[in-house]
């Protein structure tokens, strides 16, 4: 049965006439993935608008769920779109504003804050709760905030499909749905989502239950929406940020967590001596758990970009014990970074054991990453599938069948500046 849709729209031209263009936002981007986006379930708390403002300051799009009935301090009422969406110009910091749209519902309110004036603001009626969608014609994309039904997320598939249909109906080729799906990504992937849908997730718990419920589903194909779980801001959900591994002249810091253990790659005891083991260890905020990527060229064997994975602590590069003579089971370590051409090793940068490619064997889960050593063709692996602190990171042949092996699967999380 066709779902009834109630659509309301705010034209970009009217927004301009009313002086709604945000200040403090970014310049128009060339592609959908150049938008930095985030999602957070506020759990209705009126006092959580301050946390939402901090998240919005770091992102061009913020999707919110369980939004309180009262608007935030510093929000100037602009008008009502249709009967249910209130529009505010929201001052979130000195000289920085966001366009805030709150959709009032009989269940839980939704909101979206943007650094730009949307082309349209649309309510899409759902089986249980609606979706709130904004369009960005400049980037050929629509963004939507959803809060799926509790328990089993039975309405996820139709909500995502409706957003995709509404975006396509407006001549937009791309769409992204963010929110609380009340369903883990592993279950969401089995729902019969649109054929081009991808699930951008952090691989970590986002709710106090220990489940991962907050993420993004989109048809955009990119490595630039890596997910990071932010600090708790008073809700029973954590905010999730989506941003690039590479940005500007200085690559951002990142952490790398193993899917089998939820622990981070860590330079043993913060030692900066050549040959120091790389292990897994629980997150402690230390600099020896932070890394940077340096693009180094293209792999001749796979066609993928090669990266140096550099320790933020020592500036040394991830390498493998015994270098080009290494084999199955040799441990990963840090070492003085080689020259771009692989010197002092031989064979040029294609034979340099400090060069890794990021592989995504499951196209529908683009943040799930394998770290492949370009010289040896072997993969970073948590030895013996150990889940405890101190386990060695070794290299090993790939083990993935239908799905990648958890101890060879990693998530890369850009570090969030304003925590």
Question: Model regions: which residues?
Answer:
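Soluble non-cytosolic domains of exported or imported proteins
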Residues: 42-47, 66, 150-154, 259, ...
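Aromatic-rich beta-strand patches that line glycan-recognition/binding surfaces
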Residues: 276-282, 330-336, 391-397
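N-terminal, active-site-proximal structural segment of metallo-dependent hydrolase catalytic domains
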Residues: 2-9, 18-91, 158-160, 236-238, ...
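Active-site regions of metal-assisted phosphoester/phosphodiester hydrolases
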Residues: 30-55, 105-250
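Residues that flank catalytic or metal-binding motifs in active/ligand-binding sites
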Residues: 33-36, 106-109, 128-130, 139, ...
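Extracellular glycan-recognition/adhesion modules and their associated mucin-like linkers
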Residues: 248-272, 290-326, 346-387, 405-419
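Substrate-binding cleft of extracellular glycoside hydrolase catalytic domains
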Residues: 73-117, 121-128
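Residue-level marker for beta-strand->alpha-helix junctions and adjacent short loops that shape enzyme
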Residues: 69, 182-184, 188, 272, ...
């Amino acid at each position: 049965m066709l779902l009834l849709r109630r659509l309301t729209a705010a034209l970009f031209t009217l927004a301009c006439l009313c002086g709604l263009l945000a200040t403090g936002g970014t310049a128009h981007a060339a592609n959908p993935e150049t938008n930095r986006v985030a999602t957070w379930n506020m759990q209705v708390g009126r006092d959580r608008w301050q946390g939402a403002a901090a998240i919005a300051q770091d992102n061009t799009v913020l999707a919110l769920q369980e939004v309180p009935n009262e608007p935030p301090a510093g929000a100037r009422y602009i008008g009502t779109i249709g009967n249910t969406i209130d529009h505010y110009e929201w001052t979130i910091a000195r000289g920085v504003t966001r366009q805030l749209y709150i959709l009032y519902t009989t269940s839980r309110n939704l909101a979206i804050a943007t650094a730009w004036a949307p082309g349209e603001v649309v309510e899409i009626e759902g089986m249980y709760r609606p979706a709130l969608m904004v369009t960005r014609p400049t980037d050929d994309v629509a963004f939507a905030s959803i809060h799926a039904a509790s328990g089993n997320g039975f309405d996820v598939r139709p909500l995502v499909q409706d957003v995709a249909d509404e975006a396509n109906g407006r001549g937009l080729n791309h769409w992204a749905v963010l929110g609380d799906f009340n369903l883990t990504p592993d279950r969401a992937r089995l729902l019969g989502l649109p054929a081009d849908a991808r699930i951008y997730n952090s691989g970590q718990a986002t709710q106090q239950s220990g489940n991962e419920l907050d993420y993004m589903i989109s048809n955009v194909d990119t490595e630039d929406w890596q997910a990071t779980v932010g600090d708790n801001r008073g809700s029973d959900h954590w905010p999730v940020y989506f941003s690039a591994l590479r940005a500007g002249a200085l690559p951002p810091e990142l952490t790398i967590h193993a899917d089998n253990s939820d622990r981070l790659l860590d330079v043993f005891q913060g030692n900066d001596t050549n040959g120091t083991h790389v292990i897994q260890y629980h997150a402690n905020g230390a600099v020896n758990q932070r890394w940077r990527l340096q693009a180094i060229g293209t792999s001749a064997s796979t066609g993928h970009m090669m990266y140096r994975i550099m320790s933020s602590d020592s500036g040394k590069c991830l390498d493998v014990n015994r270098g080009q003579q290494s084999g199955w089971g040799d441990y990963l370590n840090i070492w003085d970074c080689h020259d771009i051409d692989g010197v002092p090793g031989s064979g040029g940068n294609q034979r340099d054991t400090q060069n890794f490619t990021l592989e995504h064997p499951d196209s529908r889960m683009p943040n799930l990453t394998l770290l492949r050593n370009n010289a040896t063709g072997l993969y970073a692996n948590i030895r013996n599938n150990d889940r405890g602190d101190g386990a060695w990171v070794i290299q090993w042949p790939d083990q993935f069948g239908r799905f990648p092996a958890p101890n060879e699967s990693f998530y890369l999380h850009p570090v969030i500046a304003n925590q």
